[in-house]
Amino acid sequence: MPYLANLRYAPEPCRQYLHDIYNSVVLNDVVRRNKIRDVDLLARIVAYVIGNIGTTFASTSIAKFLKSEHRTVAPETVLNYIKYCAEAYLFYQVNREDLQGKQILATNEKYYMADHGLREAVFGGNMKDINLILENIVYMELLRR
C-alpha cells in the first residue's frame, strides 16, 4: 500500500486506510460485479479465509457450521464467493501438488492474500498467527520471482 508511506506510520490512519481499501475491494469489486445479495455472508466467508490463510479447508465444513448458526448456504455458494474474491485479486488460489487418485477431485486448495495488510484491516494485529503471515509473505515472494 504505497499511500501508507505518506501517513508517517501513525497507527490509526494506517488502519483506517487499510480498512477503506478492504471495503472498496469487497464491496465495490466483489459485491457489485457478482450481484451478491447477502453481503454479511460474504464478509464472514472472507474473514474465515483470511483467518485461515495458507491452510486447506472444506466448503462443506463452512456450510455445515453456518447451518448450525441457522444460516442456510450451499457449499457451492461458499466456493463461488471465494472464487469471486480471487477474481478481484483479494486471494490467490494454489492447487496442491501432492494429491493422487480421487483426492484430486476434492477442493483442497490453499488461498493466500494478495496483500497481508488487508488482514490487518480485518483482524487488527498480526502477531497471533505470525506463521500464517510468514507463509503468505514467502508465497508472494515466490510468485513474484
What spans do the regions from the language model cover?
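Accessory nucleic acid-recognition modules appended to NTPase machines
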Residues: 2-145
